[in-house]
Amino acid sequence: MQYEDKNGVNEPSRRRLLKGIGALALAGSCPVAHAQKTQSAPGTLSPVARNEKQPFYGEHQAGILTPQQAAMMLVAFDVLASDKADLERLFRLLTQRFAFLTQGGAAPETPNPRLPPLDSGILGGYIAPDNLTITLSVGHSLFDERFGLAPQMPKKLQKMTRFPNDSLDAALCHGDVLLQICANTQDTVIHALRDIIKHTPDLLSVRWKREGFISDHAARSKGKETPINLLGFKDGTANPDSQNDKLMQKVVWVTADQQEPAWTIGGSYQAVRLIQFRVEFWDRTPLKEQQTIFGRDKQTGAPLGMQHEHDVPDYASDPEGKGIALDSHIRLANPRTAESESSLMLRRGYSYSLGVTNSGQLDMGLLFVCYQHDLEKGFLTVQKRLNGEALEEYVKPIGGGYFFALPGVKDANDYLGSALLRV
């Protein structure tokens, strides 16, 4: 069911404003309430935070360089479109929904109560932008024979295959398209997903879904504080500076000199890995061994033998690995050689917690997400270096896939994937 919406943020309705004025009047009659009226209730965001928004139009999609929000969801879909025209309809529709949801506005009213409501209603009558980003990526399978797109497939895009330590569940792998939905709060993420599914019943079918989180204080630091994963270590310390445009052109974005299809310029290769942690086993492992495995101090995040989280380890002066073990995670992931400079990538991972496994173990771990201009030089090269690392005893990749994050939407007349479908 279609309806018209506005991309700009609308003010709450008159009724809601009057209700708010009435509540303030009651609060003013109570000295304690009056003294605390500028504070947000525990566990809630301030009105300013709820109205934070990221720009939707631009050369690149939001949600890649955007400082990590507190809540995240990965949703892979199978595309039900029957031909290229249907696929264009899907991408245009997704663009319209993303534009509205990320900028906020009044929830649509349902003209006929005998019909299903036009909105789920879980955010109330006003849909605050809440720092929402929705990033659309396409998988290897979208370039099969259905839509005639095979000649336009990104050169390095491929189906994810098993690494030695993987225990992949087919139900948690791959997808024609992937949505990365992030916001300040989980309810905004869920609302966005339900809106998208409601508008695409004949075009998309959910393949798998996982929800993630980082701490509120890490999210509110706008990238200045490194999130801590569920093994208790800082996750993403060695990330390249996402505010350095020149560096991001080198590390994250596909550029014109890469001999890729022209439509891919401004996009990025995305690797997704759903990694289960053996947290009970980890929690019984001595601290010294944990730190040796990672190569970092658990509390400060500093490389072993150093003082601060962002101190750069000097492996050349420690060739035998007496300070930082040769098979430590940080040393294998980034040996800091001239050759390893080409395998830099931007990580954007989140923790997850799902309950218990069939064996009665806690089901929690990491939703690993990274972006790079070249999948083979980036994630695949790094993962090959990590094969056999000591950390493998405590982690088990169970799903994910490789995708290509589409370039951004130029303006209101453009749509996601337009350059791909116009070829």
UniProtKB/Swiss-Prot annotation:
Disulfide linkage: none
Outcome of swapping G349F: Loss of deferrochelatase activity
Residues in the signal sequence: 1-35
GO BP: any one term: iron import into cell
Consequence of substituting D235W: Loss of deferrochelatase activity
Enzyme Commission number(s): 4.98.1.1, 1.11.1.-
Binding residue positions for heme b: G236, T237, A238, H329, N334, P335, R336, R347
Pfam family, one: Dyp_perox_C
Swiss-Prot/TrEMBL cofactor(s): heme b
Keywords, in A-Z order: Heme, Iron, Lyase, Metal-binding, Oxidoreductase, Periplasm, Peroxidase, Signal
Reported effect, H329A: Loss of deferrochelatase activity. Great decrease in peroxidase activity on guaiacol, and loss of peroxidase activity on catechol. Still binds heme
Variant or mutagenesis effect after changing R347E: Loss of deferrochelatase activity. Great decrease in peroxidase activity on guaiacol, and loss of peroxidase activity on catechol. Still binds heme
Domain of life: Bacteria
Cell location: Periplasm
Cofactor note: Binds 1 heme b (iron(II)-protoporphyrin IX) group non-covalently per subunit.
PTM characteristics: Predicted to be exported by the Tat system. The position of the signal peptide cleavage has not been experimentally proven.
InterPro entries: Dimeric_a/b-barrel, Dyp_perox_C, Dyp_perox_N, Dyp_peroxidase, EfeB/EfeN, TAT_signal
GO MF annotations, alphabetized: ferrochelatase activity; heme binding; metal ion binding; peroxidase activity
One GO CC term, this protein: periplasmic space
Main location: periplasm
Catalytic activity as recorded in UniProt: heme b + 2 H(+) = protoporphyrin IX + Fe(2+)
Subunit details: The heme-bound EfeB forms a homodimer whereas the apo-form mainly exists as a monomer. Part of a ferrous iron transporter composed of EfeU, EfeO and EfeB.
Function: Involved in the recovery of exogenous heme iron. Extracts iron from heme while preserving the protoporphyrin ring intact. Also displays peroxidase activity on guaiacol and catechol in vitro. The deferrochelatase activity appears to be closely related to the peroxidation activity, but the link is unclear.
Protein family according to the UniProt entry: Belongs to the DyP-type peroxidase family. EfeB subfamily.
Protein name per UniProt: Deferrochelatase
